[in-house]
Amino acid sequence: MLQGAANSQHYKGTGPGGNQRLRYRIWILSLLVCIPAIAVAFAYFDVPVARRVYGILGSAESLATGFASAVLLSIEAAIVLALVILRITRGRLSPFREATVLACLTSICAYAINDSALKFFFGVPNPGAMFHGASHAFNLLGGSARCSFPSGHMVLAGAFAGVFMRLYRTSILPLSVLLLVAAVLLIVGDWHFVSDVIAGAFAGVSAGLLAGELWLAHSNGASRD
């Protein structure tokens, strides 16, 4: 269903091997920057920032309900279902709609892995639990879906954005701004620590970029056959 994307001018850019190596090196550099940034934030900024911003948004329960992960996942699933039905009835989708399907599926999968594996592995209590006496520390292999590290919201949003960042280069700046706004809201809303959103954004965007890269390689390979 997604092969029409390969013919779109927006999707050019797998490039020669040199470009792929450059992108890989940029990702490695980003990883090397993010790891110490997460460590420093976890040790020195998470708790002080959480205490400083506590209650700034007042009662954000309605906002939290409206943007709960289950709601966002349901919206993405509904979009995928609608576009699949459209593909069946019309025989094709525009490249942008195909990219949307890929972005939604990548986002859903990345969120599931984060919620069922990464949060369980790291086991960091969320800010609400910390304010009720929990220690802000890693509890390896002792976590649950209610833990906060990495941020599921940022993984969800980052994976969706990462696909479009790879397939539509002009979307990089606006999507980066939106991710930054989302990260700030998650911190100010007492849902996540600084380290949570950094780790979640990196993991999510990485998943999206990888999905876009693999799709481009698959599409270009299919077009040569």
Regions found by a protein language model. Give the residues of each.
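Aromatic-anchored segments of alpha-helical transmembrane domains
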Residues: P36-A43, S107-N114, L179-W191
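N-terminal transmembrane-helix/juxtamembrane module of multi-pass inner/ER membrane proteins
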Residues: L2-A82, K119-L141
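Membrane-interface loops
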Residues: R51, S94-R166, T170-S171
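Structural signal for the C-terminal ends of transmembrane alpha-helices
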Residues: H10-G15, L81-L93, M165-Y168, L210-L216
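Residue-level signature of transmembrane alpha-helical entry/exit and packing/kink sites
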Residues: W27-L31, P95-A103, V197
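Transmembrane helix-loop junctions in multipass membrane proteins, especially transporters and channels
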Residues: V47, R51, I88-R92, G123-G128, ...
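Alpha-helical membrane-inserting segments
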Residues: A41, D46, L81-V84, C109, ...
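Membrane-embedded catalytic cores of phosphoryl/pyrophosphoryl-handling enzymes
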Residues: G17-R25, L29, S135-D225
